[in-house]
């Protein structure tokens, strides 16, 4: 069976994106390999190795720069699941992550929306036990 292994997030700068995801969100840097022409293969992922990895791809050209921060058209485009929403919310907020709301409870679990350093929206989600998402 196939599984989603990596998604691409277009960024303005490799190092500022690494700093945000590692220092503020709490991801780990999986790989940072130099390629030709100043390009790098930069991969971050949630600590513990669960879920898909995120390839941080520096924008090349106007078309790619235009989508930075709007890769889901202003909607929540990324979903980060946790077992401890309250703890992760507090830690991330203290680290400077911008949350757009207070945590709330939905029928599928607890959720709060945050923005990455470019304005892409993410759900931090603690699925309810037994929900289709858990």
Predicted regions and their residues:
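Conserved beta-strand-loop-alpha-helix junction that forms the acyl-donor binding cleft
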Residues: 11-14
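Vicinal oxygen chelate
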Residues: 1-8, 28-81, 87-117, 125-134
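Short Gly/charged-rich anion-binding patches and loops
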Residues: 16-17, 87
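Conserved active-site tyrosine of GNAT-family acetyltransferases
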Residues: 17-22, 92, 119
């Amino acid at each position: 069976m196939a599984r989603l292994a990596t998604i691409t997030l277009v960024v303005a700068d490799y190092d500022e994106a690494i700093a945000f995801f590692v220092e503020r969100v709490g991801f780990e840097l999986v790989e940072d390999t130099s390629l030709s022409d100043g390009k790098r293969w930069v991969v971050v992922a949630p600590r513990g190795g669960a879920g898909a990895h995120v390839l941080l791809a520096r924008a090349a050209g106007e078309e790619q720069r235009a989508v930075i921060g709007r890769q889901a058209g202003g909607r929540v485009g990324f979903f980060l699941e946790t077992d401890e929403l309250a703890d992760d919310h507090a830690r991330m907020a203290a680290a400077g992550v911008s949350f757009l709301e207070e945590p709330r409870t939905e029928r599928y679990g607890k959720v709060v929306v945050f923005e990455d350093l470019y304005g892409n929206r993410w759900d931090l989600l603690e699925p309810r036990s037994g929900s289709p998402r858990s």
